[in-house]
Each structure stands twice: as C-alpha cells, then as structure tokens.
C-alpha cells in the first residue's frame, strides 16, 4: 500500500501576497499524478485553507479535484468543519450528522482512521471524551487489520518549536494516548501542523509530521535542491517492515 501525505497548504486566493501557495499545491498534485505506481490514497492532514471561508475551499477543491487517486482529509486548526462538509459533499465519509470529522477508511491493506483534533478556542489541538470514545469503538470493530491514524496536530513534544506541546493541554494528549493503549494493530500516526519533518510517539505508536506544502511557511532544514519546491511524503507499507517514509520534493 502506498500513501501520499500532504498538509498545511494554507490556501488563500484572496491574499495576493501568498498566491504562491496555489502554485505549490498545483505542483504537488501534478507530481503525485506522475508517480508510477500511483499512490493508493492521498491524505491531507489539515489546514487546507488559511482560514475557513468558502472561496478558499472552492480553490482547494479545484486543485485537489485533479488528483488521480482517492483523497481523504482531516481538519486542521485553520479549517472549518462545516465548510469542509459543504465543499466535499460527494465524500460519504464526511457524514453530516457527526459532530467531529472522524471516520474509518476500510478499503485498503491498511485500515485508516481520521481523527479530529480541532480545539474550539485555540490553534492548538484538543481531544475530548467524545472523540476518544469514538476512536475506541472504531478500533474495536477490527483488531486484526493493520491500522494507521491521521490527524492534524502531533500528539508529541517538538522541542525546537516555539510551542513544544501542540495541544491545549497534556490531558488531551493523555486522552488520546489512553485510547491507543494496548491497540497493537495501530502501527503509525501521520500528522501535520508543525510545518516540519519530525517524528515522535503517542503511546507505543510511531508518529510523524510532514512538512507544509506551502513553501513560505515551511520549517526545518532541507537539501538545497528542495528550497524552491513543495514537499510531501510517500509512505509505503509492507507486512514485513511496516511503513517506510520518503520525503519528496515536487518537480
């Protein structure tokens, strides 16, 4: 199974100062479409738009609609749940009667579960009892199939960040960690938000962040050849090694 992960596109077609972000995403989508073999799935781990107004999601849909493989999304702190549902109505995984954007994807070699880490009050992450109970129920439905979760906020400390803790408080991280405790079939967590390539753990699950597609807000050290290119990650799964990750610069 091959997963392409993109994140933190921060589209804002109303602000000419950040028009480059549109080109960054277009280049990224074109590069994914040229891959051979194509990924089985693309996951966008949030901050699709720089703030959740309709025109920004319309632009996102225009570009992301060009993908030649299925797209699944988790919401970032800059996103709006209602606008995501309105602009991606054809995707039945975004059910209108759910409070949070959390759902399983069952049709691949690895089961994927999107988690909603939006806080109602800050740009940091949150995870409440409702979301934790939903995750536990979803995990219990299939304890045998390898499973990966994807979410916006990384639930581990990033020491070189201005805000090492990416959640509102440690209690929210503990809520998530407890829900994953003993879930041996959960083999990976994919995150965004930090705008950099960084790894950690949540409970006993290896976790990683993908750099932002938007070059102007990307953080971290990269080869010189990456400087002017949007970056995304390819996660390749096999049953012997689990996930192997490649950070790729779009041409």
Describe the role of every protein-language-model region.
Residues 1-59, 158:
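N-terminal active-site segment of His-dependent metallophosphoesterases
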Residues 2-11, 109-119, 148-150, 205-211, ...:
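Active-site-proximal beta-strand elements of phosphoester/diester hydrolases
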Residues 5-7, 40-47, 71-77, 116, ...:
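Active-site neighborhood of phospho(di)ester-bond hydrolases with catalytic His/Asp-centered motifs
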Residues 11, 50, 119, 155, ...:
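Short, glycine/acidic-enriched loop or turn micro-motifs at the edges of active sites
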Residues 11-15, 82, 121-123, 157-162, ...:
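A short acidic, helix-capping loop that chelates divalent metal ions and anchors anionic groups
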Residues 16-20, 161-168, 222-224:
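Short glycine-enriched, charge-decorated loop/helix-capping segments at active-site entrances
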Residues 28-41, 124-206, 231-234, 242-244:
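His/acidic metal-ligating clusters that form di-metal
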Residues 54-136, 141, 172-176, 181-185, ...:
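Extended active-site neighborhood of metal-dependent phosphoesterases/phosphodiesterases
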């Amino acid at each position: 199974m091959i997963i392409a992960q993109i994140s933190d596109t921060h589209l804002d077609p109303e602000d000419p100062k950040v028009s480059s972000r549109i080109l960054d995403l277009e280049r990224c989508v074109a590069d994914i479409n040229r891959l051979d073999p194509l990924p089985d799935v693309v996951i966008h781990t949030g901050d699709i738009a720089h703030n959740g107004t309709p025109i920004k999601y319309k632009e996102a849909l225009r570009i992301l609609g060009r993908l030649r493989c299925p797209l699944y999304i988790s919401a970032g702190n800059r996103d709006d749940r209602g606008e995501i549902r309105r602009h991606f109505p054809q995707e039945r995984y975004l059910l209108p009667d759910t409070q949070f954007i959390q759902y399983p994807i069952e049709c691949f070699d690895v089961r994927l579960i999107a988690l909603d880490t939006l806080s109602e009050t800050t740009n940091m992450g949150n995870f409440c009892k409702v979301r934790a109970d939903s995750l536990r129920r979803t995990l219990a439905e299939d304890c045998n199939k390898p499973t990966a979760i994807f979410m916006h906020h990384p639930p581990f400390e990033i020491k070189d960040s201005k805000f090492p803790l990416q959640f509102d408080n440690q209690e929210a991280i503990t809520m998530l960690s407890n829900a994953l405790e003993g879930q041996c079939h959960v083999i990976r967590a994919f995150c965004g938000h930090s705008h950099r390539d960084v790894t950690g753990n949540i409970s006993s699950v290896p976790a990683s962040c993908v750099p932002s597609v938007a070059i102007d807000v990307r953080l971290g050290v990269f080869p010189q050849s990456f400087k002017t290119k949007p970056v995304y990650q390819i996660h390749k799964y096999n049953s012997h090694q689990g996930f192997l990750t490649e950070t790729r610069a779009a041409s």
